[in-house]
C-alpha cells in the first residue's frame, strides 16, 4: 500500500501488501479448515463472463427457483442516489412519468452525502433547473454545503415533484421481458427481495451494476492498485486536502480485480490511517474512487476535458446492446478524467436533466407486447403503455449451478407485508450466487453486540468477518441512541467502549470488516445455516461460515433463514417507541417497522422535517428499541424474571429495571407480575440469559444476539440495555469459537470452560458460576400449594403460574372455598373460565376510575379495573361481554381513557362475540375517534399526541372485526390503514384482517 498526498501527488512506501498474519501456520490451518468445510456443501466452480466487477468468483452457491414479489410498477426506475439520478427522476416526474428511486443509504446523495464531499469546486456553476434549485444559494468559490440542510432540500425537491423513493435498497438482479430486454430490477433490503417493474432503468451505481447484470461488458481491468480517498470532518490528516472543516486524504490500495472484499479492504486501510466516528458529524460512509474501467457504450468520449452536460454525447450513457438502460455516473463510456467530473454534483445534475427528459420520452413510447416490445406510434400509445407484460422474469446467469445440498433462503413477503393490492410476482430461475469469502465465524452487524462477538471469537483464534450495513461501526450504541442506561456493570462492557477504539481492537485481532454490506438472505444446508447472502452496490454475493452470529438488531438473518419470531406482538399493536436524535434533544417517536421499506424511508424523511432545522447533521439511524423477537429454544418470560430463574447454560446476566418506552402486553403483567420498575429499584434486578435463548428454534449454526434475542416483549424492555448487549455479544462470540475449536455444535458444546472464562473476566460473577449455572427446578406440589396462600406476593404468584395446568386443580378448589380477586385473575391467566362470572360482577361493582394518558414512561402500574378488563378476554367466555361493554360505554375517547380503552378493547376482541359489535361500532362513530389515517406523511404524525389517536382507532376497529364487524365499519377502517405510511399500523391492520381469512399473521 502506498499513501497518496493529495496536495503534492507524492507517494511513499508504507508497508508490503498483503500483511503477514501473526501465527501464520495457525492462521493457514484455520483457512484450510474453513475451506474444507465449504467442500461439504458441494460448491461448483464456474466461469461467468458477464458478471459485474466484484462478482467474479471460483465458487458459487445455488439459489433455487422462486417467485419474487413485485413492489412497484413504474415508468422509470433510478438505481442509486447520485445527483444525476435525482435530477433525472425530478425531471421525468415533472413531465408526467411515474418514477421510483432506490438507494442503498438512508439519505441522498451517493457522491456527496455518502462520501462527505460537501463542497462545490470553483468551476461548478449550476446550469440546469434542478441544479439551480439545489445549489443556487451555495455556488461561487469553493462553497461548502450543510449536510442536514442538503439532505432535506433533496428530499423536498423529489417529494414536491411526485418522485417516490426507497432507502436502504440495493440492486441484486434485473428483470427481462420475453425479448430479453431489461424491464426492471430486483432489489434487496431489510424486507427481503422484491422486483420493481420499469420501462426504463437509469443506473447511477459507480460500477454500472444494473447494466452489467443485464449483460453489458466493460473495458479490461488492468491495474493492480487504485487510488482511494476518504473525507473526515473537523480533523487534519497529514497529506490531506483541506476544504474548510473537511479533510480529504488518500492512499493507493491493492485492488487487482475490484472485488467486493478488495474494496472493503481499501475502506479498512483508509480508516487505519485515520478513523473517527461521531453519529452527528458528517464523516464519510464510504470511500471515493474512480473506477479504472468503464462500460462499453454506444459512444465514447476520449477527451480529458469535460465538454459540458449539454455537449456530451448521450451515447456515452447507453450500454452497448442493452436497450432501455442508461448509465449516469462514472461507469459511462468516458475517459477517466471526465469520469471524475461525473462524481461531482453539478455536472451530474445537469446531465441528469437531459437523461430524465430522454427517459421520459422513451418510457412513453415503450409498449409491452407478448414476446417483446414494439415502439408505439398510434394516438393510443400512452394508454397502451400502462399495460404490463405477463412474461417478465429475472435474468438468469450465464451458467447454471449443478444440484447442490446448500440453497439460499430469502425473505419474500414483499416491501409492505400487508399491502392492499398485490402487484403480483415474477419468476426467478435457479441462479448462481458467487462466494466472496469463507470464515469460521461471520458476524452480521458491527454494533453493540456484534463488535464484542467478533472480538471474542477472533481472540480465540477464529477467522472472523464483520458484515456491517452502514459505513461506520457502532450500531445503535454509537449512531442511534448513544449512551448507557443501567445494565450489568461488570465484565467486558467495562472496556472503554467507543467505535474508534473498537475498530483498532478488531484490526489488532485480525477481524475483517465489510462496510456498506447488507445481509439479505441465508445459505442453508437443510436446517443448518452455513452462510449469509449479501447485497452491495456491486450486486449479490455470499460469504460462508461455520457459525453465523446475527447481530443485526432486527434478526434479519434469522428471519431470512426461516426462524420464528414475534413482531408487533402477533396482532397486538404493542412495540416500544424509537428515538431520533436531533428531532428534540432525545426524542421518543413513533415505533418503526424496519421491514416496511416505505415506512422506514418516510420515518427518516419526516424525522428530518419535524426535527430541529439548525443542526449540522443528523444521526444516521433511528434508534430502535424493539423489532423482531426471535423464538429460541427457550423464550424468557416475566415469570423467569420474577423467580430469578437460572439455567445450566447461563452465559450472560442483564441488570436493569423495567423500562417499557410504551406499554405492556403480557397477561402475566396484567395479572400482577410487572417486573420491578425504575421507580422501585434504582440499581435494577438480574435476568439470567441462557445460551438456548440465543439459538433460533429449529436452526443450527446460527446465534442471535442484541435486542432481538428470545424473550417476550415485556422482558425485552429490561434486557436490551447497551452494557448488557455488549456482554451478551462477547459470550456468543466466545461460544462460537469454542464450539468450532472443539468440533461441537452450538447445542452440544461443553459449557463449563465457557462459563469459567466468563466468570474470569466478570461477565458473570463467581457466585453465579458456582450457584446459578444450573436449571431451576420445576415447582413441587408443596410449593404450588403454598403459593395459593399468598398470591399478592409476586414470587408466589409467579411460582403458581409457572406450574401451569398443574396448578389448576388446587387453584379452582381454593377459589371455590374462598374466592378472591387474585385467585380469579390467576385462573383467567391459565385460561380457566371458573372465575369469569365473579370477575364480571366485580367489574360491574367498580367505578371506571382514572385512566392513564399515553406517555412513553407512564405505564408502570396496572389498576385492578384494567387488569380485570384485559384478563376477562383470556378464557374467551361470552359471560364477560356484557360487563365489558358497559365499561366501554363509560370510557372517553382520548386523554386518560387510553389505558382503559386498550384493556377493554383487548378483552372484547379476544372473546370475539358478535354481541359486542354494536357497542364497538358506536364507540368508533363518536366524534374524533375515526379519521386518523395518514397516507402522505405529516411530520407531526411521529409524535405521541398524534399517533395515539390512531392507536385508539385501531384498537377499537381491530376488536370490532374480531367480533364479526358491524356494517363493514371495522374492516373499512383497517383497510384504510393498509395505505398508511406508518408501517406498524399497516402490519397490525393487515394481521387482524388476515386472521379472518385463514392466511395467518407473522411466523
Predicted feature residues:
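Short, low-complexity, charge-dense intrinsically disordered segments
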Residues: 9-12, 16-19, 24
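A conserved beta-strand/loop element that lines the FAD pocket in flavoprotein oxidoreductases
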Residues: 161-171, 507-519
Amino acid at each position: 500500500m502506498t499513501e497518496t498526498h493529495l496536495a503534492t501527488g507524492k507517494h511513499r512506501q508504507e508497508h508490503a501488501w498483503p500483511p503477514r498474519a501473526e501465527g501464520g501456520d495457525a492462521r493457514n490451518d484455520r483457512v484450510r479448515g474453513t475451506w474444507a468445510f465449504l467442500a461439504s456443501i458441494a460448491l461448483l466452480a464456474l466461469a461467468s463472463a458477464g458478471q459485474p466487477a466484484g462478482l467474479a468468483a471460483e465458487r458459487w452457491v445455488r439459489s433455487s427457483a422462486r417467485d419474487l414479489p413485485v413492489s412497484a410498477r413504474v415508468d422509470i426506475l433510478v438505481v442509486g442516489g447520485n445527483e444525476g439520478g435525482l435530477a433525472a427522476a425530478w425531471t421525468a416526474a415533472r413531465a408526467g412519468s411515474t418514477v421510483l428511486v432506490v438507494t442503498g443509504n438512508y439519505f441522498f446523495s451517493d457522491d456527496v452525502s455518502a462520501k462527505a464531499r460537501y463542497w462545490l469546486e470553483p468551476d461548478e456553476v449550476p446550469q440546469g433547473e434542478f441544479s439551480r434549485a439545489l445549489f443556487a444559494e451555495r455556488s461561487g468559490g469553493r462553497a461548502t454545503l450543510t449536510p442536514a440542510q442538503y439532505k432535506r432540500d433533496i428530499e423536498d425537491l423529489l417529494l414536491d415533484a411526485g418522485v417516490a423513493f426507497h432507502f436502504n435498497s440495493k440492486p441484486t438482479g434485473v428483470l427481462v421481458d420475453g425479448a430479453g430486454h431489461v424491464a426492471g430490477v430486483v432489489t434487496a433490503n431489510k424486507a427481503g427481495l422484491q422486483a420493481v417493474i420499469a420501462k426504463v432503468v437509469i443506473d447511477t451505481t459507480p460500477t454500472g451494476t444494473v447494466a452489467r447484470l443485464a449483460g453489458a461488458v466493460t473495458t479490461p481491468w488492468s491495474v493492480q492498485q487504485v487510488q482511494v480517498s476518504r473525507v473526515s470532518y473537523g480533523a487534519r490528516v497529514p497529506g490531506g486536502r483541506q476544504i474548510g472543516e473537511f479533510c480529504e486524504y488518500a492512499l493507493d490500495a491493492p485492488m487487482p480485480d475490484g472485488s467486493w472484499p478488495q474494496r472493503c479492504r481499501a475502506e479498512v486501510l483508509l480508516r487505519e490511517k485515520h478513523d473517527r466516528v461521531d453519529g452527528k458529524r458528517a464523516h464519510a460512509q464510504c470511500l471515493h474512487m474512480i473506477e479504472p474501467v468503464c462500460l462499453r457504450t454506444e459512444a465514447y468520449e476520449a477527451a480529458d476535458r469535460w465538454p459540458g452536460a449539454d455537449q456530451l454525447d448521450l451515447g456515452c450513457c447507453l450500454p452497448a446492446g442493452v436497450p432501455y438502460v442508461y448509465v449516469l455516473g462514472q461507469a459511462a463510456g468516458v475517459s477517466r478524467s471526465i469520469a471524475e467530473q461525473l462524481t461531482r454534483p453539478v455536472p451530474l445534475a445537469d446531465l441528469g436533466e437531459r437523461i430524465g427528459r430522454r427517459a421520459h420520452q422513451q418510457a412513453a413510447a415503450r409498449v409491452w407486447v407478448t414476446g417483446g416490445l414494439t415502439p408505439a406510434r398510434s394516438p393510443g400509445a400512452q394508454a397502451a403503455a400502462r399495460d404490463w407484460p405477463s412474461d417478465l422474469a429475472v435474468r438468469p446467469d450465464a451458467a447454471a449451478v449443478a444440484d447442490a445440498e446448500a440453497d439460499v433462503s430469502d425473505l419474500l413477503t414483499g416491501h409492505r407485508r400487508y399491502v392492499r393490492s398485490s402487484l403480483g410476482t415474477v419468476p426467478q430461475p435457479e441462479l448462481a450466487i458467487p462466494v466472496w469469502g469463507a470464515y469460521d465465524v461471520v458476524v452480521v452487524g458491527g454494533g453493540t453486540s456484534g463488535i464484542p462477538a467478533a472480538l471474542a471469537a477472533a481472540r480465540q483464534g477464529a477467522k472472523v468477518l464483520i458484515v456491517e450495513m452502514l459505513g461506520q461501526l457502532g450500531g445503535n450504541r454509537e449512531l442511534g441512541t448513544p449512551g448507557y442506561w443501567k445494565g450489568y456493570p461488570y465484565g467486558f462492557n467495562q472496556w472503554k467502549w467507543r467505535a474508534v477504539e473498537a475498530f483498532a481492537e478488531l484490526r489488532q485481532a485480525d477481524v475483517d470488516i465489510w462496510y456498506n454490506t447488507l445481509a439479505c438472505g441465508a445459505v442453508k444446508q437443510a436446517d443448518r445455516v452455513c452462510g449469509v447472502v449479501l447485497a452491495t452496490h456491486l450486486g449479490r454475493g455470499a460469504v460462508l461460515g461455520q457459525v453465523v452470529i446475527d447481530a443485526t438488531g432486527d434478526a434479519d438473518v434469522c428471519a431470512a433463514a426461516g426462524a420464528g419470531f414475534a413482531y408487533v406482538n402477533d396482532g397486538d399493536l404493542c412495540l416500544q417507541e424509537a428515538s431520533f436524535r436531533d428531532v428534540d434533544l432525545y426524542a421518543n417517536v413513533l415505533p418503526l417497522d424496519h421491514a416496511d421499506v416505505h415506512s422506514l424511508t418516510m420515518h427518516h424523511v419526516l424525522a428530518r422535517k419535524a426535527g430541529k432545522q439548525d443542526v449540522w447533521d443528523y444521526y444516521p439511524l433511528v434508534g430502535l428499541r424493539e423489532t423482531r423477537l426471535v423464538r429460541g429454544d427457550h423464550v424468557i418470560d416475566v415469570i423467569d424474571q420474577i423467580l430469578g430463574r437460572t439455567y445450566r447454560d447461563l452465559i450472560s446476566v442483564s441488570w436493569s429495571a423495567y423500562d417499557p418506552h410504551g406499554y405492556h402486553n403480557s397477561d402475566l403483567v396484567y395479572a400482577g407480575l410487572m417486573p420491578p420498575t425504575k421507580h422501585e429499584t434504582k440499581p435494577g434486578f438480574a435476568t439470567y440469559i441462557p445460551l438456548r435463548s440465543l439459538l433460533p428454534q429449529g436452526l443450527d449454526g446460527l446465534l442471535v444476539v442484541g435486542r432481538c434475542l428470545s424473550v417476550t416483549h415485556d422482558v425485552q424492555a429490561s434486557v436490551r440495555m447497551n452494557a448488557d448487549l455488549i456482554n451478551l455479544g462477547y459470550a456468543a462470540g466466545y461460544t462460537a469459537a469454542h464450539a468450532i475449536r472443539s468440533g461441537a455444535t452450538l447445542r452440544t458444546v461443553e459449557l463449563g470452560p465457557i462459563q469459567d472464562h466468563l466468570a474470569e473476566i466478570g461477565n458473570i460473577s463467581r457466585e453465579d458460576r458456582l450457584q446459578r449455572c444450573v436449571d431451576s427446578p420445576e415447582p413441587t406440589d408443596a410449593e404450588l400449594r403454598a403459593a395459593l396462600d399468598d398470591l399478592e406476593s409476586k414470587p408466589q404468584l409467579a411460582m403458581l403460574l409457572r406450574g401451569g395446568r398443574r396448578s389448576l386443580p388446587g387453584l379452582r378448589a381454593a377459589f371455590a372455598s374462598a374466592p378472591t380477586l387474585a385467585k380469579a385473575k390467576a385462573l383467567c391467566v391459565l385460561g380457566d373460565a371458573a372465575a369469569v362470572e365473579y370477575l364480571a360482577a366485580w367489574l360491574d361493582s367498580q367505578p371506571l376510575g382514572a385512566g392513564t394518558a399515553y406517555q412513553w414512561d407512564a405505564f408502570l402500574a396496572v389498576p385492578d379495573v384494567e387488569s380485570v378488563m384485559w384478563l376477562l378476554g383470556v378464557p374467551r367466555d361470552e359471560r364477560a361481554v356484557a360487563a365489558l361493554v358497559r365499561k366501554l360505554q363509560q370510557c372517553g375517547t382520548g386523554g386518560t381513557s387510553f389505558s382503559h380503552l386498550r384493556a377493554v378493547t383487548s378483552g372484547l376482541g379476544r372473546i370475539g362475540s358478535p354481541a359486542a359489535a354494536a357497542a364497538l361500532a358506536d364507540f368508533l362513530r363518536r366524534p374524533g375517534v375515526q379519521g386518523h389515517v395518514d397516507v402522505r406523511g405529516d411530520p407531526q404524525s411521529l409524535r405521541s399526541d398524534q399517533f395515539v389517536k390512531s392507536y385508539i382507532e385501531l384498537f377499537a376497529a381491530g376488536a370490532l372485526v374480531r367480533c364479526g364487524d358491524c356494517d363493514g365499519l371495522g374492516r373499512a377502517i383497517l383497510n384504510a390503514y393498509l395505505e398508511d405510511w406508518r408501517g406498524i399500523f399497516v402490519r397490525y391492520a393487515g394481521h387482524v384482517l388476515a386472521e379472518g381469512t385463514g392466511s395467518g399473521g407473522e411466523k
